[in-house]
């Protein structure tokens, strides 16, 4: 499974990239807003740090506007992926952009049907939102399972990015299902390191070593 970092925080991207853990980055207008910086500047800096895919989202709601924005965004760097919402206009844009060799990430996927439509339109990636489904009492991980089954059955090459990841279980379970990517907030990625037995083990090793030195 590939790990994307779901953030526009450049310092956090540098931190985790130095550990060899960042295969790509996903951003959205809300994440960019948090940084209080120019949109294009942030995307350009992220692309200079991370060599993998960097998703940048369009703001327009019509296909023509999305395509226009996409063509400006891909000028930033060759690893920019255009993030487009799951709408009819969005799929029209995805169809055109994919034929021009521009990579796309269809976002706000909440059903297997939506994922299938995006794949048929030519999306490079689809991003089903597991956490938001959990929030309304539905099973977000079940959606990942359904999408993986359908894509596997038909040999669909569109990659599945597990998005709206809220806790480590989302990562573990989607990895078991064979999802291609999890895009993870940095606070959740931090939690993947943690286990109480690891801490206990380190403490014991240090205590034993200290006792050995005092002999």
UniProtKB/Swiss-Prot annotation:
It comes from the Archaea. The active site is at 83 (schiff-base intermediate with substrate). It comes from Methanococcus vannielii (strain ATCC 35089 / DSM 1224 / JCM 13029 / OCM 148 / SB). Its EC number is 2.2.1.2. Belongs to the transaldolase family. Type 3B subfamily. It holds the Pfam family TAL_FSA. GO terms for cellular component: cytoplasm. Coiled coil: none annotated. This is Probable transaldolase. Keywords: Cytoplasm, Pentose shunt, Schiff base, Transferase. Transmembrane segments: none annotated. Transaldolase is important for the balance of metabolites in the pentose-phosphate pathway. Pathway: Carbohydrate degradation; pentose phosphate pathway; D-glyceraldehyde 3-phosphate and beta-D-fructose 6-phosphate from D-ribose 5-phosphate and D-xylulose 5-phosphate (non-oxidative stage): step 2/3. It is found in: Cytoplasm. It catalyses: D-sedoheptulose 7-phosphate + D-glyceraldehyde 3-phosphate = D-erythrose 4-phosphate + beta-D-fructose 6-phosphate. One of its GO terms (biological process) is carbohydrate metabolic process.
């Amino acid at each position: 499974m590939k790990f994307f970092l779901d953030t526009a925080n450049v310092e956090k991207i540098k931190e985790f990239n130095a550990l060899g853990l960042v295969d790509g980055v996903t951003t959205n207008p809300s994440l960019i807003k948090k940084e209080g910086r120019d949109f294009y500047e942030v995307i350009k800096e992220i692309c200079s740090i991370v060599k993998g895919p960097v998703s940048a989202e369009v703001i327009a709601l019509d296909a023509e506007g999305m395509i226009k924005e996409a063509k400006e965004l891909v000028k930033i760097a060759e690893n920019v992926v255009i993030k487009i919402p799951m709408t009819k206009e969005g799929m029209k844009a995805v169809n055109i952009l994919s034929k021009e060799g521009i990579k796309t990430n269809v976002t706000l996927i909440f059903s297997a049907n939506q994922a299938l439509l995006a794949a048929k339109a030519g999306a490079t990636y689809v991003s089903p939102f597991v956490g938001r489904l959990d929030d309304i009492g539905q099973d977000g991980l079940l959606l990942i399972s359904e999408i993986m089954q359908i894509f596997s059955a038909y040999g669909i090459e569109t990659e599945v990015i597990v998005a709206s990841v809220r806790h480590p279980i989302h990562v573990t379970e989607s990895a078991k299902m064979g999802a291609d990517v999890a895009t993870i907030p940095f606070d959740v990625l931090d939690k993947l390191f943690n286990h109480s037995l690891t801490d206990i083990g380190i403490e014991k090793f240090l205590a034993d070593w200290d006792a050995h030195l005092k002999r």
